[in-house]
Amino acid sequence: EYKANREEAPDDLAPQFEYIRKSVEAFNLPSIELLNYEADDLIATYAKKITEAGAKVTVISSDKDLMQLVSNKVRLFDPMKSKVIGEKDVIEKFGVKPSQVIDVQSLAGDSSDNVPGVPGIGVKTAAELINKYKTLENLLKKASEIPQNKRRETLLSNKDKAMILSLIHISEPTRHRG
């Protein structure tokens, strides 16, 4: 279900992939392509391995899902806005720390990743709840204690929707060409 709404690459984009591959090869840059792995999952996996080795990482992307990777060792560069995105920027956009972005997206939903979210809960309310309860798991455990009747009932009856995460998967395969 996750990313089920993902469309195939547009007809005018797909032919460009081979040009990108050839350009990367011409510059003698290593490249990574693994069947059945999302690019953001590979990016997260490599970012983790690189930071564990003691280096800092800059990820070049405008994909907001990658904001959950931001830390004192990982930053994003959004080429569309020509802007470096650090922890403060993530907090400004989502109202929570980067490590909590996934919980906010799970509650508020994200149609581009087929994450339904909880009806009636947007990013602002999701951020308030996550800031108060610290994690989605803790919020759902304590949902019966929420004082607002409608919010409490909505959360209790939509726990399954809240648990559909847009979590980036960090996995072991890290083979590359180049």
Language-model features, listed with the residues they occupy:
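Non-catalytic nucleic-acid-binding/docking modules located in mid-to-C-terminal regions
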Residues: E8, F27-P30, K73, V84-S171, ...
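Noncatalytic, basic helical substrate-engagement surface that gates or grips nucleic-acid strands
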Residues: E1-I60, K64-V84, K161-L167, S171, ...
